Amino acid sequence: GGLYEHYQDNMQNPTFSLGIYTFSDVRAFLENRPLRFLGLGPEGAIDRYWRFDLLGAFVQDAWAVTPRLTLNLGLRYETSTMPIEKYGRDSALPDLLAPAPTTGRLYSNPPRRNFSPRFGFAWDPTGRGRMSIRGGYGWFINTNNQQNLIVTVTNPPATPRFVITNNVTFPNPPFERGVGNTMRPIEWNIMNPSLHMWNLNVQRQAPGQIVLTLGYAGARGVHLMRNTDINIPAPAR
């Protein structure tokens, strides 16, 4: 079998235009004395229009090795193209020490080694149809990770998000005193998240139309996505 999907992710989210005020304590909050403001400037764009494709293929077969043993074998491959913003407003940070982000693409290249095998079996050890042992293993790769694009909407230069720390006013912050920009880039050498799953079950038919089952299932995730702050200051002692 095969798969082809073309995606148009048209996003316009006014939530990104909301700012965040920080107060030093409850009294400062009640007296309307903000300590810090983080938010978009008046010209910040809150829309993005991404385009990308998802392609895949798979083979699968059930093989009756003997009347008592059946194998299920499969292999799947999927890949996605680089998400491209219609107006070229994507930006990235390949080098964490770089003074400014690069524009035009979000990360280096989509990973291509996305072969994911499947294996399963069903075995009747006695040949009397009263007991079965079943098991399987699968490697599942998530190649459609474009939900992470949303975190890049507030990245400069298209959508600068300013930090204001001096003489912050409410409700109209002084953007002309904004110091620097914040950025939420995607890992430049990104890897696709994957999940290894396996299970083993033993079933036994008991008298009175009762079936006893003992099973074990496990899973292990690799390269799972998460948000992390790479610029956390060292805790004071």
Language-model segments: residues:
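Short acidic-glycine motifs
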Residues: G1-R237
